[in-house]
């Protein structure tokens, strides 16, 4: 991290503190560098700026929902779509939800696991590029077909 990004993350933390949304964490670490504690934030509605921004900090937001349809609607209304994670004891439910979630990378019962053999990237405003795997090469190349009779 760098100082401007640290201040951006601190700004989001200050907003969450002012709205009494911090469940755990929320403090800058007292050490050299630009670090903050992993932080759990409670969202009350989707108008919350923290709900709609990519912070790229150790901030995780949670919001209650009643139905699977409401969950999908909440998740997909974000203009971003880099990653998402589902935490559940019901694997069949997770498998039903996966195709409906607009995210380039989706984890079930884990988060931030990256495998170099699997493409990683986003959708929507999070970008369309991919890193890792053969998809990385294909994303940055253009195919050209050439046929020659000699």
Q: Whereabouts are the PLM-identified features?
A:
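Conserved C-terminal structural/oligomerization subdomain of aldehyde/semialdehyde dehydrogenase
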Residues: 28, 35-150
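ALDH superfamily catalytic-core signature
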Residues: 1-45, 108
């Amino acid at each position: 991290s760098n100082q401007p990004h640290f201040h951006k993350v601190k700004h989001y933390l200050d907003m969450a503190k002012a709205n009494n949304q911090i469940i755990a964490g929320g403090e800058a670490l007292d050490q050299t560098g630009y670090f903050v504690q992993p932080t759990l934030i409670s969202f009350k509605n989707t108008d919350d700026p923290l709900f709609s921004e990519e912070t790229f900090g150790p901030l995780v937001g949670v919001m209650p929902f009643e139905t699977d349809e409401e969950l999908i609607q909440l998740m997909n209304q974000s203009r971003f779509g880099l990653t998402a994670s589902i935490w559940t004891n019901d694997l069949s439910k997770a498998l039903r939800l996966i195709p409906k979630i607009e995210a380039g990378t989706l984890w079930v019962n884990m988060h931030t696991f990256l495998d170099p053999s699997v493409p990683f990237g986003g959708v929507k405003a999070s970008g369309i590029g991919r890193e890792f795997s053969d998809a990385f090469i294909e994303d940055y190349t253009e195919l050209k077909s050439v046929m020659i009779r000699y």
